């Protein structure tokens, strides 16, 4: 069993702490509109910056509701400030890390995905072959086999959920985002036409894991005009 380095454990703590604060902010933002709807108050479409002003405007004539909602808004404000601190810390860490900067040369890979991959893999020498990375993190189909039949099922979902989710989000950006055309996107679009978008996203996530590991191992940036793998 691989024992993560202290630096990797610090990076993971930063990622999970940032995610925790972000999730709590989202919980408040998602819960309040539904709660206020019970009083006939409709929040409507509003961005994060104007969210608090909109809520306070709605409850201004409802003193009891305002007294209850006020602490939630104050808690949200504090959470957003602390989330911002961790997010800036993360961006600075990525900016000064040459491995993360190299990983970000790949399509769909931003600071969060790069740092997550760097943290979870920790040491590329752990994997003798780049193709092992996708299987290790649960992005390969399960094989069901008996004496009479052999079929593949859904992905195994073993390994680190944080990395698997990050790769999935990166793959979604590759396939649906407006970014520069590249061989990985072309391959993923072809898979989507044959097998559907959901399977294409998983396939691109798996291939992206292979590409990122190879880039890290070989100290090379993503080659936009060359074959991906």
What are these regions (language model features)?
Residues 1-229:
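A detector of single, family-specific signature residues
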